[in-house]
Amino acid sequence: MDPQELTNEVLLESILDCTHFVSHEVPNLFKSVKESLPHSDKIFFMNFVEDENGEDEYYGYIYDKTTAAIYEYYFQDSKSLKNRKLSLAKIDISKLTTKDILELPALHLL
């Protein structure tokens, strides 16, 4: 196995771990994204960042394998369903680099 394959495997594992974490530890975010992208059955989270002030705010990137699109997201959670806010912005993949999303080279493995 060459170093590039190993690197891609590590990056793939990072994507899968991040997606698993969000789906189990931040289920409101996962549910909100699924509701916003109802025709997407394969969604993967990357670059998950949690607000350090305990405000239940999260941001990062989502890869929608169904449409081969990447979205930047911002999510503000709340105990009250009415106050949850999700912002999704589709990003032009061709303009992204590994400085934006470290896992970018591994997307083809999903």
Where are these regions (language model features)?
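Phosphoinositide-binding peripheral membrane targeting modules
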Residues: E52-Y59, K65-A106
